[in-house]
């Protein structure tokens, strides 16, 4: 009886499928990383078993790829002990097809590597002079502020034109916003007509320096703005009838300082290191003592546990014309504790 012959076509088909499988495996083998470090190694693993084409299809400038198909233990050793994966291949060698996002452009650096740098569109800016930013800093122009926003402060905006001021005099706020001065004697533009949502938790309650309990930070801001003078935050939670600072629990590393003038406590940030700068201006405090700076005054208050506030700039024994101007502004009761409200 004749034996059945093996068809050579079937064997060829099997070999072809095997080669295709191996080719697919080699194309898929590899690891995708989110960045290439300065040491040349890949760091921050994004996904395993990706081909270079799949890994680099995102268009991210920092994405890199390694072709080694290794086990989890090796990956762990690379990331923890070796500073990243070796043989790191960056997806982008040039700026071609690189998407840096709004306000940024791709440029080749000194090492001939593509990098995304801040390059905001300043062509439509009409005011070329100084501007005061929401961070209380003066910028040489709006374009410089936009660059600062791009680098590290995404919420940064222009408050008003001109340098940042210590009074509301000559400050022109845009739109319906109003100029007020916070507890650090910096002028800000704020809007009062904000609708505050109802509080969803009792933890949102705040006690104001006026002894009134406010449902939320939004309600305290709005009340301050409508009142046109400083209220300020005493402490978190509902107001209590405290006899001393022992009855008040401060959070967030704050310390209770007692205000003998009104018989209430106030939680304040302490432990701030005062800079050794000769440019700091002395201040006259509410205890009629002169301190080298506002920071030195706060330091003394934290040390004694008694609240101190700035009466005016300069020595208590000499009131300058500028101080009289400031007192004139204080009579208008422009003071808004933005810094004390927004810090939490």
UniProtKB/Swiss-Prot annotation:
SMART domains: FOLN, KAZAL. Pfam families: FOLN (PF09289), FST_N (PF21333), Kazal_2 (PF07648). It is found in: Secreted. Residues 30-103 form the TB domain. Residues 112-166, 186-241, 261-318 form the Kazal-like domain. One of its GO terms (biological process) is cell differentiation. Residues 94-117, 167-190, 244-268 form the Follistatin-like domain. Residues 316-344 are annotated as: Disordered. Residues 1-29 form the signal peptide. CDD domains: KAZAL_FS. Glycans are attached at residues 124, 288. Residues 321-333 have a biased composition (Acidic residues). Keywords: Disulfide bond, Glycoprotein, Repeat, Secreted, Signal. Its main location: secreted. SUPFAM superfamilies: Kazal-type serine protease inhibitors (SSF100895), TB module/8-cys domain (SSF57581). Disulfide bonds join 32-55, 42-88, 56-91, 95-106, 100-116, 118-150, 122-143, 132-164, 168-179, 173-189, 192-225, 196-218, 207-239, 245-256, 250-267, 270-302, 274-295, 284-316. Gene3D superfamilies: 3.30.60.30, TGF-beta binding (TB) domain. PANTHER family: FOLLISTATIN, ISOFORM A-RELATED, FOLLISTATIN-RELATED. Monomer. Binds directly to activin and functions as an activin antagonist. Specific inhibitor of the biosynthesis and secretion of pituitary follicle stimulating hormone (FSH). This is Follistatin.
């Amino acid at each position: 009886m004749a034996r059945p012959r093996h068809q050579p076509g079937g064997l060829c088909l099997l070999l072809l499928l095997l080669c295709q499988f191996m080719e697919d495996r080699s194309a898929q083998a590899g690891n995708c990383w989110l960045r290439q470090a300065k040491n040349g190694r890949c760091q921050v693993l994004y996904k395993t078993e990706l081909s270079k084409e799949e890994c680099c299809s995102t268009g991210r400038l920092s994405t890199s790829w390694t072709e080694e198909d290794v086990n989890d233990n090796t990956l762990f050793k690379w990331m923890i002990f070796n500073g990243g994966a070796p043989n790191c291949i960056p997806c982008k060698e040039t700026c071609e097809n690189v998407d840096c996002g709004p306000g940024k452009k791709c440029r080749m650096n000194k090492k001939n590597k593509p990098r995304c740098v801040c390059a905001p569109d300043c062509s439509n800016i009409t005011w070329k002079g100084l501007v005061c930013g929401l961070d209380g800093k003066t910028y040489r122009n709006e374009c410089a502020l936009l660059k600062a926003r791009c680098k590290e402060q995404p919420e940064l905006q222009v408050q008003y034109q001109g340098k940042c001021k210590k009074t509301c005099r000559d400050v022109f706020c845009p739109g319906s916003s109003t100029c007020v001065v916070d507890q650090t004697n910096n002028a800000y533009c704020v809007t009062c007509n904000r609708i505050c949502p109802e509080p969803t938790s009792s933890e949102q309650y705040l006690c104001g320096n006026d002894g009134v309990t406010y449902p939320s930070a939004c309600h305290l801001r709005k009340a301050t703005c409508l009142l046109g003078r400083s209220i300020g935050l005493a402490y978190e939670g509902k107001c209590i009838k405290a006899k001393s600072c022992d009855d008040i629990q401060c959070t967030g590393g704050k310390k209770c300082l007692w205000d003998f003038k009104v018989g209430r406590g106030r939680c304040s940030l302490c432990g701030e290191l005062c800079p050794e700068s000769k440019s700091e201006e002395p201040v006259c405090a509410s205890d009629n003592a002169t301190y080298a700076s506002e920071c030195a005054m706060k330091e003394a208050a934290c040390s004694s546990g008694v609240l101190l506030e700035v009466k005016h700039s300069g020595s208590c024994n000499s009131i300058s014309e500028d101080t009289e101007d400031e007192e004139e502004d204080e009579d208008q009761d422009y003071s808004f504790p933005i810094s004390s409200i927004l810090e939490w």
